[in-house]
Amino acid sequence: MSAGSVVNRRNKILQQLSAKGSVRVTDLVEVLNVSDETIRKDLQAMEERGILRREHGGATLTSYNEEEDVGRRSTENTEVKSRIAKEALKYIPAGEPLVIAFDAGSTSYCLAQFLAQRSGQTIITSSIPVAELFNGDKNDVYLLGGKLRQKDRSLYGQWALNFISSIRISVAILGSSGVKNRNGLCAVTFDDADIKRAYIKNSERSIALLDSSKFHKCSMVESAKWEELDMVITDDGIQEEDREVLSKKTNLIVV
């Protein structure tokens, strides 16, 4: 069985969970036309990744998988996110014709607010709010195509991935959902994880921005190992244990 078919099947399970809140093994066997054993292995693997909680005869969606809208996220921990964004500016030289990619993270949005004051940049983004910051003629802005997710006003899907694969990015700016008990950057959906992976693969440098609260929250999908990132910037609220782990795996900056 190909890795692609496994991912597609588990994505369908996630869609069922998102729509209903819970699923039964017998129903999934019928809908997906696979064996009882295959479904149970899928549910076990998804539970280990923090996506669901197995129960007798099925599974339920874990409560922390609920997405928050971009407006709400942008107003949380604003002082901390501003500090992280200002630190990131030091690693993005002004006056150079850089190609800078942004995902739909709220801390990424905070950094974009500062970079919007510069000129001569090429901006690539999956986020409509980020694209709207770079108005006027000072910068070239490319908004990824694809399907619109209303929750955070971002675009995703194969069109977006095809576009990313055709370009070379100078710096990829990445946010993350909760990373508690995970080995790297996380996302709330498989589609968002795909965007992050594509950015990392096609960039010269990747910088992750995440406030320390993310280390206390669980998340659905792991999108990249810490070792794949060139830099992680967080605030001084990070616990010593998490600091030690990240310092061994990537260039960790604490502000």
Question: How would you describe each model-predicted region?
Answer:
Residues 2-26, 30-101, 112-120, 135-139:
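HTH-adjacent hinge/linker in prokaryotic transcriptional regulators
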Residues 106-108:
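Gly/Ser/Thr-rich loops at beta-strand to alpha-helix junctions
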Residues 2-17, 21-26, 33, 80, ...:
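Conserved phosphate- and dinucleotide-binding cores of soluble alpha/beta proteins
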Residues 102-103, 125, 234:
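Short beta-strand scaffold positions
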